Amino acid sequence: MSIKQMPGRVLISLLLSVTGLLSGCASHNENASLLAKKQAQNISQNLPIKSAGYTLVLAQSSGTTVKMTIISEAGTQTTQTPDAFLTSYQRQMCADPTVKLMLTEGINYSITINDTRTGNQYQRKLDRTTCGIVKA
C-alpha cells in the first residue's frame, strides 16, 4: 500500500502550481489547509488500497492534517502486527517524494488502524520531525 500509486510527477506539478498561486493571497496556514484537502482528495480517488492484510479505506483532511483510516481485512490473516505495519507504512511514506513535499509545506498525517479482529485502534502521526525533515 503506497501513496506512490498516484501519478507522482503530475501530482507534484499540480501541488506546486497550487502552492504558487495561493502563496500570494493566502496565509501559510490557509495554504497548508488547502493542500491537505487536495492531498486527501487525491488519495481518496485511489481507494481502497490493500496491502499485507490491511486496507486503506478513508482519507480526509482536518485543517493541515490528512487523516487516513486503515482497517484489518476481516477473515484474512495479516502478515504483520498493526504496530509493525504502521512502522513499515511510516517508513514508506517518509521516503515518498510527494509526502516529503507535503510535510515541508506544513501538512501532517494521522494514520489510524482499526483492527476489526480485536476492536483495538492503533495510531501514528507523521510530521517533519518523525520523518527526519529539517525545516529549510
From Swiss-Prot:
Q: Which residues form a coiled coil?
A: none
Keyword annotations: Cell outer membrane, Disulfide bond, Lipoprotein, Membrane, Palmitate, Signal
Q: What does it do?
A: Part of a type II secretion system (T2SS, formerly general secretion pathway, GSP) for the export of folded proteins across the outer membrane. Required for correct assembly of the type II secretion system-beta (T2SS-beta), for localization of GspD-beta to the cell outer membrane and for export of a labile enterotoxin by T2SS-beta. Each AspS2 binds to 2 GspD2 subunits and may clamp the monomers together, stabilizing structure and accelerating its assembly.
| Gene Ontology CC terms | cell outer membrane
Describe its membrane topology.
Lipid-anchor
Protein name per Swiss-Prot or TrEMBL: Pilotin AspS 2
Subunit-structure text: Cryo-electron microscopy shows that the complex forms a cylindrical channel with 15 GspD2 subunits, each of which interacts with its surrounding AspS2 (GspS-beta).
Indicate the family of this protein.
Answer: Belongs to the GspS/AspS pilotin family.
Additional detail: Encoded in a type II secretion system (T2SS-beta); this strain encodes 2 T2SS but only this one (beta) is expressed under standard laboratory conditions.
- UniProt main location, coarse: membrane
Q: What happens when the gene is disrupted?
A: Severely disrupts assembly and function of T2SS-beta, mislocalization of GspD-beta to the cell inner membrane.
At the top level, the lineage of the source is: Bacteria
InterPro entries referenced in this protein's UniProt entry, alphabetically: T2SSS_2
